[in-house]
Amino acid sequence: MTTFTKPLSKLIGHFEKFPGIGPRTAQRLALFILKQSESSIRDFSKALLEAHSNVGHCKKCFNLTSEEECDICRNAERNQNIICVVAETKDLLALERAREFKGVYHVIGGLISPMDSIGPEILEIRSLVERVSKSEIDEIILALTPSVEGDTTSLYIGKLLTPFTKVTRIAYGLPMGSELEYVDEVTLARALEGRTNLI
């Protein structure tokens, strides 16, 4: 078994904490970093710190942004009366790649999962209800992962929002447990077109 010097092992360990990064990929990334010039490493470190310090959440939809409101919420050409609810920013990005949805979003920050001690109170569901209750919203589209957690979250949100507006859920041409970020653009576009009433 290959052993690395302590600083290199530490660097590999940090990369292994990244989602989807296994030991081999972490090792490749660490070795790549070591081949870079000192100025490149400084630039990389600066970019990491700047992103961490300056990127926060949109006060309206909780998408990532460096402004008070994200570009989508500030875009006058977007339909502000249709809100697509997603679990994470990565799901929003996947839907934007499909170029089908012309409304705005609400990022709730995860899915209800009692097994992982994630209840609705720690997600941005209350802010969604407030947003809908104070505005003229024509439709809420739930675009949550097809899983037990996604279904639970969709039903919970649906019951809260149905008194205020129409609530639909995107159709799925993918198996249970699939992540939205890995679904191709055509499938996502069709899922939006084929959405159905939740309740």
UniProtKB/Swiss-Prot annotation:
Give GO MF terms, alphabetically: DNA binding; zinc ion binding
| Zinc keyword on record | yes
Q: Which Gene3D superfamilies match?
A: 3.30.60.80, 3.40.1360.10, 6.10.250.240, RecR Domain 1
Pfam families given in the database record: RecR_C, RecR_HhH, RecR_ZnF, Toprim_4
Identify the residues that the record assigns to the Toprim domain, covering every copy: 81-175
- Name the Gene Ontology biological process terms: DNA recombination; DNA repair
Q: Where are the zinc fingers (C4-type)?
A: 58-73
Protein keywords: DNA damage, DNA recombination, DNA repair, Metal-binding, Zinc, Zinc-finger
UniProt keyword annotation of NADP present: no
Q: What does the UniProt function comment say about this protein?
A: May play a role in DNA repair. It seems to be involved in an RecBC-independent recombinational process of DNA repair. It may act with RecF and RecO.
Classification via PANTHER family: RECOMBINATION PROTEIN RECR (PTHR30446:SF0)
Q: Which family does the UniProt entry place this protein in? A: Belongs to the RecR family.
**Under what name is this protein listed?**
Recombination protein RecR
User: What gene, per UniProt, encodes this protein?
Assistant: recR
